[in-house]
Amino acid sequence: MLLWLADWLGEYVRAFNVFNYVTLRAVLASLTALGIGLALGPWVIRKLAELKVGQAVRTDGPQTHLVKTGTPTMGGTLILLSIGITTLLWADLTNKYVWLLLAVLFGTGAIGFYDDWRKVVYKDPKGISARAKMFWQSAIAIFAGIYLISTASLPAATELIVPFFKHVIYPFGVVGFCILTYFVIVGTSNAVNLTDGLDGLAAMPVVMVSAALAVFAYVAGNSVFASYLSLPHIPGAHEVAVFCAAMAGACLAFLWFNAYPAQVFMGDVGALALGAALGTVAVIVRQEIVLFVMGGLFVMEALSVMIQVASFKLTGKRVFRMAPLHHHFELKGWKETQVVVRFWIITMMLVLAGLSTLKLR
């Protein structure tokens, strides 16, 4: 929106042409989302408290979590609001990827919102059925896959890129691409949701991963940089960097209120949406494997649940004291803040490893 205004003003004052630079708009998007989140945060938390949208805590979990009962949840609405407003302000609204990302973000956010609402109304920590949640997540992911492959302008936009190796690619057909897109988007969405179990645990990793994906998006959208770094050139992908920057800024603002002891929880409305958005960005810029590396924390959390369930069904025994993984370490004696900060450090190392694939090929 502001880009259109800047283009018009640029005809009279050349200084406004500076807003054509994606890097500047990405920085401004991050700051804008951060500002909106910090400004609206107290009001949103107050309204959630007035609506008695309190978190229902599992009684079979760590007993230290019982004090969190009643803390306002659905704080992800603040994140989505900040991202939405900021993206509309600073992104190029003629870019197809911008609208796809907003559709995925708010589509999965709506699923999470309904899930959270059921938890609050019925005081049931389980929310809506897993089958219903998976159905709607799948519908959104398949839509994204079909849309991307039907609008792809170059073969590179649908090829799987293997990091650390030059020119090692695997072309996909329509079905293969949609299947990959499905697993990346739905998998990341649920993995982030599983990670969001401690104060600040999910927000900071999302900040780091989204900031790193912004770099990949900028490079993929620039033919010169993409060629130099042996990455696929995806026309228009540079605008995705603005969205990623907005996501990082919004989550950073949310962390201000979600840091221990949390004043508000993200809820499914935020976690499902952020995970799906990260997955969609990775698919757009053809960095699904790199997302698997940088989002290793999310992968570990999801795997811990799958391993726990499979082990219990097959052998009747549990591998972990409790799943997801962060609860396992809590029950081993780690304090909540120790788990969170140590998992942040792990994510930082994984993100740096992911960024290294830009050059190490």
Swiss-Prot record:
**Bilayer topology:** Multi-pass membrane protein
Query: Which NCBIfam families would you find in this protein's record?
Result: mraY
Q: Which family does it belong to?
A: Belongs to the glycosyltransferase 4 family. MraY subfamily.
Source organism per UniProt: Laribacter hongkongensis (strain HLHK9)
**Gene Ontology molecular function: any one:** phospho-N-acetylmuramoyl-pentapeptide-transferase activity
Q: What is this protein called?
A: Phospho-N-acetylmuramoyl-pentapeptide-transferase
Q: What taxonomic ancestry is recorded?
A: Bacteria, Pseudomonadati, Pseudomonadota, Betaproteobacteria, Neisseriales
Q: What pathway is this protein a component of?
A: Cell wall biogenesis; peptidoglycan biosynthesis
Enumerate the HAMAP family for this protein.
MraY
- Cofactor (UniProt): Mg(2+)
